[in-house]
């Protein structure tokens, strides 16, 4: 089953230090706990517009590269942004994991002052694609509502609400098919 942590994933916190407004790395805490509980492979799909440097640092420090598949939007070269849908779907379709931890960054929005290049519709597509492909593969998703620096805050909340609606939409479709 899917789950949501309406918090940030804290992906900038490194092994030895807090960084980039992140005190500890919740994505990695969750990933390690899931592995300790018996999962063979965890995927972290980080769609915050900034590179999840702390997440990668901890994966490297703990030598978890074979156990954790880390894909981060922040590492996508600018030249590939127009091809995001193709690149993202390719990654989702090849993904093989027991659980997906999804950082649904609102700062990827084109009007975000600290990054962003995605339209609202592209972000909706991003969320729908992730939840739909994972549902088809029967891979549970736990997502966080990260990033987002637009003012007024209502704009960020609307983007997070879209992620939640897409997750629920896919859940309802799956329930009807069963």
Predicted stretch roles:
Residues 1-178:
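A general "terminal functional-core" signal
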């Amino acid at each position: 089953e899917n789950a949501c942590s309406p918090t940030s994933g804290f992906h900038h916190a490194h092994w030895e230090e807090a960084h980039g407004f992140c005190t500890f790395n919740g994505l990695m805490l969750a990933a390690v706990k899931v592995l300790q509980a018996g999962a063979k492979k965890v995927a972290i799909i980080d769609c915050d517009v900034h590179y999840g440097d702390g997440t990668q640092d901890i994966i490297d420090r703990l030598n978890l590269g074979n156990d954790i598949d880390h894909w981060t939007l922040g590492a996508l070269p600018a030249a590939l942004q127009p091809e995001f849908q193709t690149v993202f779907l390719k990654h989702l379709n090849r993904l093989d994991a027991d659980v997906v931890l999804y950082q649904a960054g609102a700062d990827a929005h084109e009007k975000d002052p600290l990054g962003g290049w995605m339209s609202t519709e592209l972000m909706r597509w991003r969320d729908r694609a992730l939840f739909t492909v994972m549902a088809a593969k029967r891979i549970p998703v736990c997502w966080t509502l990260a990033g987002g620096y637009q003012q007024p805050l209502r704009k960020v909340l609307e983007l997070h609400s879209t992620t939640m609606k897409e997750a629920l939409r896919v859940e309802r479709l799956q329930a009807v098919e069963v």
